[in-house]
A protein has these predicted regions:
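Intrinsically disordered, low-complexity
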Residues: 1-37, 146, 155-199
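Secreted/periplasmic proteins that engage bacterial cell-wall peptidoglycan
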Residues: 25-70
Length: 199
């Protein structure tokens, strides 16, 4: 997708999300990503993996850019236990034993999957072949049966702001994500009475 198309799309999204809170924007953009083609290592509005969808929704909702694994999201950014329902939240699927998924070996207690909360008991489950909105209650028995435990955590906004400022957790983002990041940073809200300023 070229820059002109990305700008046009993001301008339309800006109009739609102007009056929403950060949490509402996060949920909106997760919903917007339903039916994306799953592709490992991607994070754009056409293709994404699980952590990429959360990182992209964070960028578009808050204006802060990170690109990390599901495990890093859990350990560094979504550290608030028992989060408020009006906060940005994510479900994490933690393996109970060492397991190989594709070419990757996940160690016991490592997060192998994540899904951002797009509503009450609704997550964007970004898996092959396409991402889809699912009930977390429906996913729980499936993942419990595969020996995962699930934890819902809230965003630590301070950690996100610090990482965005330092640029330290931006590993291997695709070209589209970098373009979204550039456009979002150009359009940041400057009114201090509003939220931090994404689209």
């Amino acid at each position: 997708m070229n820059e002109a198309k990305i700008r046009l799309m993001l301008e339309a999204e800006k109009e739609l999300t102007l009056t929403l809170t950060e949490n509402e924007r996060f949920m909106y953009f997760l919903g917007r990503m339903q039916f994306l083609k799953y592709e490992s290592g991607k994070e754009n509005l056409m293709r994404s993996d699980c952590s990429g969808s959360v990182c992209l929704a964070l960028l578009l909702a808050t204006g802060c850019s990170i690109r990390v694994t599901a495990d890093a999201l859990y350990r560094k950014y979504f550290t608030v236990r028992n989060p408020d329902r009006n906060s940005i939240r994510c479900a994490f699927f933690i393996t109970n034993y060492d397991r190989k998924l594709g070419s990757r070996l996940y160690k016991e207690n490592e997060v192998a999957h994540c899904a951002g909360l797009a509503g009450e008991d609704v997550v964007l489950n970004c898996v092959e072949p396409r991402s889809v909105l699912r009930s977390l209650s429906d996913l729980r028995p499936v993942y419990y049966g595969m020996d995962y435990r699930i934890e819902v955590r809230g965003l630590n906004k301070k950690a996100l702001l610090e990482a965005n400022k330092s640029g330290k957790d931006l590993f291997g983002p695709d070209a589209e994500f970098l373009e979204y990041r550039r456009i979002v940073s150009e359009n940041k809200v400057t009114d201090p009475s509003t939220s931090s300023g994404a689209l």
